[in-house]
Design a protein with these regions (language model features):
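Canonical positions in the second alpha-helix
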Residues: 3, 36-37, 70-71, 104-105, ...
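Structural marker of alpha-solenoid helical repeat scaffolds
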Residues: 3-6, 39-40, 74-75, 108, ...
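Short coil/linker segments at helix-helix boundaries
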Residues: 159-197
């Protein structure tokens, strides 16, 4: 059997020493070893994944973001790094940056419905309503049973109507107030069929039921469902 080069043996030894440090929760020691290995070819993806996780354990945000960004460039077909970076930006309130990275994710994997759905939620939060509707439509085109995307379309209109209601409350002129209320009711009505379809897709989802109850009550319609 052909003997492996000494350098390969050394790299393997360092890698397994790093794994031992990770498992033993010697985070600083693990980081030092993984940093020395991260640009090499031996188990390169795993090394960078472990390095990110160790920086998370050390609560070093700058370094774990940097690790993810570098790994995304080096391993463009490995979605794990991109997904973790997107999650970080979402949960840290950097929604526009998350939207930008989701565009990359969609370009790489256009047939993942959840990418479109998540971007739709973020666009809706940012007030990008047309973009949000397009994202939800794209998600449903890939997965017609994705009830959350259907409800997302309803929510786009529902939340706009809530905002119009808040604005109408500040109007003192009676004629203008009635006009604002009419506009608000029209937008609320637009949300109704999407929540009805979402309820048909997922009849046990209570958030859809509660929203529909409120909409039916608003328009004095009968609640044609079994609420549990």
């Amino acid at each position: 059997q052909k003997e492996m080069p000494r350098d390969t043996n050394y790299v393997q030894y360092k890698y397994y020493t790093a794994i031992f440090a990770v498992q033993s929760e010697y985070h600083k020691e693990a980081v030092q070893l993984l940093e020395e290995l991260k640009d090499g070819d031996y188990e390169a993806i795993a090394v960078n994944q472990f390095l990110y996780q160790e920086y998370v354990e050390l609560k070093d945000t700058v370094k774990f973001v940097e690790t993810l960004q570098n790994a995304i460039k080096r391993f463009p077909k490995e979605s794990w790094f991109l997904q973790n970076l997107i999650n970080y930006y979402i949960f840290s309130g950097q929604e526009q940056t998350a939207i930008d990275y989701l565009a990359q994710a969609i370009e790489r994997e256009p047939n993942v419905a959840q990418y479109h759905h998540i971007r739709g939620n973020l666009n809706e939060n940012q007030g990008n309503y047309e973009e949000a509707l397009a994202d939800f439509d794209a998600a449903l085109a890939i997965d017609p049973k994705l009830s959350d995307a259907m409800a997302g379309k309803g929510r786009v209109y529902y939340n706009q109507a809530v905002k119009l209601n808040e604005e109408a409350a500040l109007i003192s002129d009676n004629k203008a107030y009635k006009k604002a209320l009419a506009e608000m009711n029209e937008v609320f009505r637009k949300s109704l069929p999407f929540f009805e379809k979402a309820h048909e897709m997922a009849p046990e989802e209570r958030s859809y039921i509660q929203t529909l109850k409120g909409l039916y009550y608003r328009y004095k319609d009968e609640l044609d469902m079994q609420a549990k």
